[in-house]
């Protein structure tokens, strides 16, 4: 006969036997009696699900920002490339206030500028004619070579002046810029100080005006009070005026009298109450 405990073990599901006793039935493989999800697996799956949700959230919320960042980065790269190419083209870096002279176009430009300056000077001051006359007087004149030599000498002089005086010209430009900036700052400070002075004067004038107005008003009020009190007048306000009894006048009209006028008008009232003589 079989043991009843063995029968009980066979009848019960593997998940409830003594060997594989677990609390959560949903995470148990009933066929093999094993845990479906161990804590490590559960943590990994929860982390993956959380990361997936975060990625979905970021993908749905931040695509526009990513696109904007990409566009701005492309624009910055384009501007940087353009600046570097432009700098390479004319080679005008300014480290420590110095100008580099490594450009390939420097000598052709200097020669062109020298030729233009030579012709301008010759047209203005007639240098070639003056030197030709001087050479002719000293018997060194030649119709072809002397003018050419004169122009070549002038060209060399212009080149040397442009080469050696370029640094002085740049220094003069820098000094001029600094002077203009300093003068602008000084003028701005002077204008600001003048504005502050004008504003202070305006405030002082306004305060003086208010003070003078207050003094005049107080003096007028004090003088008015002194005059009223010295003359013995009594100031009657609209609230102090009361309506007296209506008294008939000789015209049959009613008159309003205040308390101050009742005592002084007794004689007039008696005269009004007297019978008027009847004409025959």
Curated annotation (Swiss-Prot):
Belongs to the UPF0494 family. InterPro entries: DUF999 (IPR009340). Keywords: Membrane, Transmembrane, Transmembrane helix. It is a multi-pass membrane protein. This is UPF0494 membrane protein SPAC212.01c. The chain crosses the membrane at residues 107-127, 144-164, 178-198, 199-219. One of its GO terms (cellular component) is external side of plasma membrane. It is found in: Membrane.
